[in-house]
Structure formats: C-alpha cells, structure tokens
C-alpha cells in the first residue's frame, strides 16, 4: 500500500527521477515557463520552491546549496541573483501551474509551470 507516501515516483528509478527534476528545474529557470505533464509539474513545484527559498538568502552558502542540486553554474547564478530576490517578501508560492491541453499521442494532461 502506498498510503501517505511523500512523493510521486513518476515511473522512474530514483536516479532517473533525480536527473529529470534537475533538468526540468534548469529549463524552468532558463525559460521562466515550461510545458510538461501535470504530475511532473507538481513534483517540480516542490523541488523548485525549496531551492528558491534557500536562494532568497543570496549569500555564498546559498550559491553552494543551489549548485549542489542543479550542477549548472548559469542556472544557479540566475536563480540566486535574478529570480529569488523578487520573492524576498513572499513566503512560498513562487510558481503557478495551469492545466493546458491533452497530449496528442497518449492524451495525458499537460500543464505549464511558471514563476509568478
């Protein structure tokens, strides 16, 4: 039984899931808005909001913490210096998820996730 399980497995191994969330987070930081499956978007929201909360501090340790998750210098720099300072007075809720359409091939629900 999977009652009260803390996260979605997304049909992937733990390493594949970790790489997927990292790549989606980098894409969201670079483009400010991406379209993906609804459940991937919901998992990404949790992942990116935790990173944004840490990045709001803006010091050297925040850079290190964010880089440890993203492993991408440009995305880390953009998150800590450009995106996170916008949310200095906001307590969570940095992203918005909107259902958009259904994918043609398998009719799965798609959604856009963007920074507010």
Curated annotation (Swiss-Prot):
PROSITE patterns per the UniProt record, alphabetical: RIBOSOMAL_L17 (PS01167)
Entry's Gene Ontology molecular function annotations: structural constituent of ribosome
A GO cellular-component term linked to this record: cytosolic large ribosomal subunit
Entry's Gene Ontology BP terms: translation
Keyword annotations: Ribonucleoprotein, Ribosomal protein
Gene3D superfamilies membership: Ribosomal protein L17
Domain of life: Bacteria
Keyword Ribonucleoprotein attached: yes
UniProt-listed HAMAP family: Ribosomal_bL17 (MF_01368)
Oligomer and partners: Part of the 50S ribosomal subunit. Contacts protein L32.
Family according to the record: Belongs to the bacterial ribosomal protein bL17 family.
Protein name, entry field: Large ribosomal subunit protein bL17
Organism: Helicobacter acinonychis (strain Sheeba)
């Amino acid at each position: 039984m999977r009652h009260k399980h803390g996260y979605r497995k997304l049909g992937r191994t733990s390493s594949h899931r970790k790489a997927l969330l990292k790549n989606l987070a980098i894409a969201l930081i670079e483009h400010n808005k991406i379209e993906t499956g609804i459940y991937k978007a919901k998992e990404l929201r949790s992942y990116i909001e935790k990173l944004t909360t840490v990045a709001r501090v803006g010091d050297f340790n925040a850079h290190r913490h964010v880089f440890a998750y993203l492993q991408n210098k440009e995305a880390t720099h953009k998150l800590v210096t450009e995106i996170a300072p916008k949310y200095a007075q906001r307590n969570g809720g940095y992203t918005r998820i909107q259902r958009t359409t259904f994918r043609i091939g398998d009719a799965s629900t798609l959604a856009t996730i963007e920074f507010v």
